[in-house]
A protein has these predicted regions:
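Flexible inter-repeat linkers and adjacent short helices
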Residues: 1-189
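Structural register within alpha-helical repeat arrays
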Residues: 88, 173, 216, 259-261
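TPR-repeat structural position
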Residues: 98, 226, 269-274
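Amphipathic alpha-helical segments of tetratricopeptide repeats
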Residues: 106-110, 150-154, 191-201, 234-245, ...
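Alpha-solenoid helical repeat architecture
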Residues: 116-120, 158-165, 203-213, 243-256
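Residue at a conserved register position within TPR or TPR-like alpha-solenoid repeats
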Residues: 177, 220, 263-265
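Extended alpha-solenoid helical-repeat scaffolds
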Residues: 217-219, 225-226, 239-242, 247-251, ...
Length: 275
């Protein structure tokens, strides 16, 4: 099944109805109609379409790519990070995300100045981190985007950029072990890494301060050491007090949620012990 067929097959009805209105003509329209019939019958056969329309495999693939881009444009008019965000938030479209990421990187490299390109790499890295299911997180891609981001970061932001990327990588590795049920066996390893690889600087901005502590919170949450979660939340809240920004206030609210979450789990475990 090609990317276009997968994309159409997993669209909600309102969006499927919307892309059905895309104006097409010629061979594009013929390929589109043939694909729609195969989707309805759930009988996917590329050769059947190329033979019927008498087009080459390469021509078919080119048309599929063109039609997929038209679907993207219909549902998400803005390209770049907006389109990647649209795909990243839908678990069915992880393959589409990584495929489109390659295209968007090439486009960004040709059109963006260094500062904007660095922010593009950072945003793409964050999309994978925040929106992808763990089974779909490509740590090598996170690493590559992170390295590209750090390389283009202004000199005064190099320390923060480097720390953010390290947080992303360690968080993802913790995520892998947590999902595999191995996190408790790796407690000593990750404790050492958190204490040696993640160094918070006194000049770090509020985003980096938050992400630094969030990585630690996630680790202790995975270990079910909720008393340590509460301790780290308090440390993070104190560290953020020197800032007076809307972003800081957003982070404080998120930390309060983490605190409430930890207290909830602690109360559940206490009840189990009593019973």
């Amino acid at each position: 099944m090609n990317l276009l067929t997968e994309f159409i097959s997993n669209l909600p009805a309102p969006e499927a109805a919307k892309i059905a209105q895309i104006p097409l003509r010629g061979v594009q329209e013929e390929v589109w109609n043939a694909l729609q019939l195969q989707i309805k019958s759930k009988n996917y056969n590329k050769d059947a379409i190329t033979d019927e329309l008498k087009i080459s495999q390469a021509h078919f693939d080119k048309i599929i790519s063109e039609l997929l881009l038209k679907c993207y444009k219909c549902l998400c008019p803005d390209e770049g990070i907006s389109l990647l965000d649209f795909l990243a938030k839908r678990s069915f479209y992880h393959k589409h995300f990584y495929h489109e990421l390659k295209r968007q990187i090439k486009h960004a490299q040709k059109t963006l100045a260094n500062e904007a390109l660095g922010q593009f790499y950072k945003s793409a890295m964050n999309l994978i981190h925040r929106n992808m299911l763990i089974m779909h997180k490509d740590i090598e891609q996170i690493k590559a985007l992170g390295e590209a981001y750090v390389k283009l970061a202004p000199k005064e932001e190099q320390k923060d950029a480097t720390l953010l990327v390290k947080c992303r990588l360690i968080y993802t590795q913790i995520d892998y072990e947590f999902a595999a049920g191995n996190i408790k066996a790796k407690e000593e390893l990750f404790t050492k890494r958190l204490n040696t690889e993640l160094v918070l600087h006194n000049t770090s901005n509020e985003e980096i301060v938050y992400e630094y502590f969030l990585t630690r919170i996630y680790f202790f949450h995975g270990l079910e050491q909720f008393y340590n979660v509460l301790k780290i939340v308090d440390e993070a809240t104190l560290a953020l007090q020197r800032f007076d920004t809307a972003l800081k206030r957003t982070f404080i609210k998120k930390l309060l949620f983490k605190k409430s979450e930890a207290l909830y789990y602690m109360s559940r475990f206490d009840k189990k012990k009593v019973s």
